């Protein structure tokens, strides 16, 4: 099983990625691979959250301005992942990122491509 997520880098690179794993443990391993370790959850409404490196400040990771703008959170560092959330048997569980974030990533990438073309 895989789930769609949106990865946001500190340099404002934003793209769709896949979180893999049949079990929660395997999915967490996949998330750790993207973020570099354990993660904290930043809630973004009922159906989405942003996952960030739990020790990002201790690791002196760079500020992620785009993730801060999208989440409304005052300080985020390092890589961030947006995933969906839904109610499960044991509380909330992760699922595909909501479509509005997939569209946002596509729109931002399109705008960046146009800007890069104009700069060339």
What are these model-derived regions, one by one?
Residues 2-120:
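Domain-length accessory/inserted modules outside core catalytic folds
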């Amino acid at each position: 099983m895989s789930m769609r997520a949106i990865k946001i880098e500190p340099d404002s690179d934003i793209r769709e990625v896949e979180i893999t794993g049949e079990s929660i443990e395997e999915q967490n391993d996949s998330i750790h691979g993207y973020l570099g370790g354990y993660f904290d959850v930043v809630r973004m409404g009922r159906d989405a959250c942003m996952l960030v490196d739990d020790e990002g400040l201790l690791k002196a990771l760079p500020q992620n301005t785009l993730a801060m703008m999208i989440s409304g959170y005052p300080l985020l560092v390092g890589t961030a992942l947006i995933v969906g959330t839904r109610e499960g048997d044991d509380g909330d569980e992760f699922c595909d990122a909501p479509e509005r974030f997939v569209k946002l990533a596509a729109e931002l990438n399109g705008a960046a491509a146009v800007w890069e073309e104009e700069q060339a």
